[in-house]
Amino acid sequence: MFGLFKKKVKEPETFQNHDQEYEFTWHEVGKDNPFNKQILDIRSFTQHMLSFTKEKYVAELFNKQRHSIGRELINTKIPKSKTINVSLVYPHNGSKIEGAAYKANCMEDKWDIYGWDNIIYLTRSWTGEVVYKAFIKVTDASFEIQKIEYTPDVYSENDQSLVVNDVHFLIKTLALGAIYPHKVPTVLTNEKDIAIYSFNRFGHNCWYATYYDILDVAVKIS
């Protein structure tokens, strides 16, 4: 199974198939769950939902971003930012991380990832907004994220772990191609609300939600 401060541009998103019935299933840790976390299977929503915008300028921004390799992001500042010191290590061949590491192919892909000057920029694909800057150190066999810069939102203001878990999830899934659970705010208790939050956040590149930190996720191989 299973350079300058930028004004934040809103993402006026419209869902298609929003009235369809969806099946959400909780899986405890065990034989039917390949992860060492309790997860909510939201694939019936995230893998079938379509998103589009009625705003021409947003569609134009999305199309413009498809041709970018992220060089224009160098020295971009994040307004009212905070930083978190971390140590997240990922396998790597030692080469410089430059250019586009992941590009959205459609509007259900919500993120682009770029690397320049030992900074990984995680940006919203619709608008180009830099949400996270991950400062890295590259070695012969790995790269380590040592610091994350971000602007707090309504959820991360009260729970910084969401920032670290978001960045880890995006690197694991988009840059490294893993199927992985993602962490959601504990204030979301309705299953459909969890699915909507997840799709807004990650588009169709998310499958299983959890309330737990995912930094130590282990995957069982059948």
Q: Where are these predicted regions, by residue range?
A:
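Generic structural hydrophobic/aromatic packing signal, biased to beta-strands
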Residues: 24-26, 37-42, 113, 134, ...
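A broad structural signal for short, well-ordered beta-strand segments within beta-sheet-rich domains
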Residues: 83, 108-111, 131, 143-147
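Polybasic, proline/glycine-rich intrinsically disordered low-complexity segments
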Residues: 142-222
